[in-house]
């Protein structure tokens, strides 16, 4: 394949991966999945009932791996056995995966809330009905974009792995990046806004999450709206860069042409550049904002 065409395909893959990363993070925010959900789960036990969708089917990596694998398996069967158009097959596979994901989401949040009835945690059916459709929408977008990335890598770039295997791997990857990147914005900056930023979380405040929004009670829509400003886009950029840069080095330095070691060296150089960049940003932030300073009341109580 011509290098120019390969770079065009890589650009399309990078765009799809960026969209997938953003939608994956917002899906986990509106449904409260992964790391921050431990505080949502703990809140009723600390006598703080809430209206936040509490699914946490599993960790994000296995959840997204299952979702993407189901979509890829359905698409593969439709393409190979029913000779369906790849575009329609990917769309239909993503729809089936979103429906399966929604089923797990509903049973998960209802089971969790029902198990907390002793702590006076209600099951809000209107909240479940209103949240499940955007959860399905985000899941569909994430799965479809992952399937597009996997299909282009398999068919156009000639990747040796089958579609389902690639979708499984990218599902784990996008879940891990969303859990480690975007969820920090939701858990650290949204759930505990009533405490001063940078002060950390005292053990006695565990479960004391923000339950009241700007108007009325807070729910997953408020969290998704907030995280769409930073957490979602950052997750999209992180996953998009991972997919694009990971494929770019082997496209420029093709191992099939005896340039495998150059691709390894290029990858190491990119990693070192990112490490230095991250270190520079951390040092700048520490110098600009400094450590957290206790106020006089806290010093007196100490």
Curated annotation (Swiss-Prot):
GO terms for cellular component: cytoplasm; plasma membrane; vesicle membrane. The keyword Ion transport does not apply. Its main location: membrane. Its EC number is 7.2.1.4. It is found in: Cell membrane. Keywords: Cell membrane, Membrane, Methanogenesis, Methyltransferase, One-carbon metabolism, Transferase, Translocase, Transmembrane, Transmembrane helix. GO terms for biological process: methanogenesis, from carbon dioxide; methylation; one-carbon metabolic process. The keyword Transmembrane applies. The chain crosses the membrane at residues 3-23, 86-106, 132-152, 155-175, 233-253, 259-279. It is a multi-pass membrane protein. Pathway: One-carbon metabolism; methanogenesis from CO(2); methyl-coenzyme M from 5,10-methylene-5,6,7,8-tetrahydromethanopterin: step 2/2. One of its GO terms (molecular function) is tetrahydromethanopterin S-methyltransferase activity. Pfam families: MtrE (PF04206). It catalyses: 5-methyl-5,6,7,8-tetrahydromethanopterin + coenzyme M + 2 Na(+)(in) = 5,6,7,8-tetrahydromethanopterin + methyl-coenzyme M + 2 Na(+)(out). Part of a complex that catalyzes the formation of methyl-coenzyme M and tetrahydromethanopterin from coenzyme M and methyl-tetrahydromethanopterin. This is an energy-conserving, sodium-ion translocating step. Belongs to the MtrE family. The complex is composed of 8 subunits; MtrA, MtrB, MtrC, MtrD, MtrE, MtrF, MtrG and MtrH. HAMAP family: MtrE. This is Tetrahydromethanopterin S-methyltransferase subunit E. It comes from Methanosarcina barkeri (strain Fusaro / DSM 804).
